[in-house]
């Protein structure tokens, strides 16, 4: 996580990279834009934005206060991502049937509604912690090509751990989604951390929080499982800013 401080102008770090969440502070009443798109600013002047998997090498951060506008180019380090090709799979392993497709659409709609949140209340500004300790079995941004068909990139990280291991909240937030059986992700929780930042926890064995509950950093959310489409016990952990997927490991490292 990189911190950008801006008052009348902008002070920037020099090493941004794809998949990163950027947090900034401006004087109250300042407007902020990223590449011409206005960014939400809290009542205290805190703002955040995300640099996605395919963020361009250069983006422009702009602020305006008292009719004085400042623009600063930010240079974004480009990353390479793992790619795995698997051929000869049965078609049902690559393309879901009509019933499954309908379930997937319903799941995606519910997840999308949570990610549209722009609550002013937020729990940002402190260091994130890892929700569970274990081997990183799946990395952000990797992609599988199944029978020649590119699938969506992996939009989070997978952490392998023993079934039943406690999963804790990496940052305080409000429980925005609790689902007992999503098609791909099984038992799933989403937290709203404010200002468009949300996180998801998937394949859980058991859920210990309820919708609307405010959880503290370090509070138990549930336990590691292998529900949904999982080949072994692990936690899928994802973080987004609005609809932009971010690399969770950059938040804790």
What are these regions (language model features)?
Residues 180, 206-209, 226-229:
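Short, conserved catalytic or interaction motifs in soluble domains
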Residues 73-185:
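Surface-exposed, glycine-biased beta-strand/turn segments
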Residues 187-193, 197, 213-253:
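Conserved, short, structured surface segments that act as functional micro-motifs
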Residues 166-177, 209-224:
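Short, well-structured beta-strand-loop connectors
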Residues 7-80:
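Cationic-aromatic interfacial patches
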Residues 17-19, 27, 44, 56-58, ...:
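Extracytoplasmic
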